[in-house]
């Protein structure tokens, strides 16, 4: 169905005279244009459905270059004109700097603009130890500090005068005045320099007095005591016409206003001449520790200390030799006469003598004298190194990190009863201790001094160590005797019955 032709458009409205003028203060009407459609109330015309408004701007690269040029070359850049400061809506105080106020109490307030009056907390002025007790006698000592009278404040408020302040009744220096701010803090006015400060000028005075006061009496006393003695040799005291005293040195043909008795060089020479001559100590041995023999003692004391150290060293050397003699015969118990002269036994004996020869300077150990003191014999029967168990400095403590069990000490894996039974099982000929050869069948003795080595080297170096390879094979094929089996059963039975045993059998 054809809707028909559209209705004719309304004729354009003729322009007539403007309406009544707008009231004052209202913006003038804009340029004449087509009237807004009815009901739109001059709202911006929305784009049709499905259309978007695209704002086309210039090249962004050129805009960035312009910004960089404005910064790098401010003279050649086209800086946009800004609104002058006079045309901006700024208060009048912006263009009028504050006038400097007179020096008065009203000018020193916390609300002022003076930046030089910031509180300064100096560490040296805040320590109560630097304050003399006599200066704060009028005040009272409180837990928060020194305060008195109106300066006292509640403990909850930490004011400046509660740290380290001088009471108000102590007079100020000339030209100074103390005032308080609205918050109660004290400051000081210097009328001489026309300045204000937070620092109390009385603190500097007290610190100067405390530094100069104690030093002056000793100096005067030392000068009086030193000047009261006789003049050095070659010096003479004389007096001028005005009554001034001067000193003549006849040795150098010179005069001086300074008393030679006050010169520390002459005083030192005088003391040295009056004191008794001291002998120079002999040169110390290289092995002597410098910390023990040094220290400014007399030569006699140093010689006594040196002799004591030498005696101690000799005594320790004798202990070690006695220990070696006590332990070495035990290694010869299980050596048969047939194997004592074997090359292997001689080699072990030579190796055991090497450390001893090095310690004694290449000479073998001498035979112990029968008149050796009982003290050395009792101290050398312990069976360990004297440097490890002597005194409380170093001792072989009980081990708490043993891997065998949870006990506080460790024991060897081989029980002692079994070792004793092995000694009884020796079927060889009985060896007389007096007829033993001089060869030693031991490892070097310094292995026994190592802590934690509880292995009996003498047992390991018995007949089994000296048997050659050809003799070892037939011995393994022999049947075990009944005596060995009986001994093993007795040892195992004793171990099972012993509840306190900490052996771990793997």
From Swiss-Prot:
Stretches with biased composition (Low complexity): 39-50, 147-156
UniProtKB keywords: Activator, Cell junction, Cytoplasm, Nucleus, Phosphoprotein, Repeat, Repressor, Tight junction, Transcription, Transcription regulation, Ubl conjugation
PTM annotation (Phosphothreonine): residues: 62, 109, 118, 414
Phosphotyrosine carried by residues: 409
Principal location listed in the UniProt entry: cytoplasm
Biased composition (Pro residues): 1-38, 279-289
Organism domain of life: Eukaryota
Region (Transactivation domain): 290-506
Claim: Nucleus is one of the keywords in the record: yes
Pfam families (alphabetical): TEADIR3, WW
Composition-biased stretches (Polar residues): 371-393, 401-411
Repeat listed as a keyword: yes
Gene3D superfamilies to which the protein is assigned, alphabetical: 2.20.70.10, 6.20.430.10
Protein family: Belongs to the YAP1 family.
Name of the protein: Transcriptional coactivator YAP1
Gene designation per UniProt: YAP1
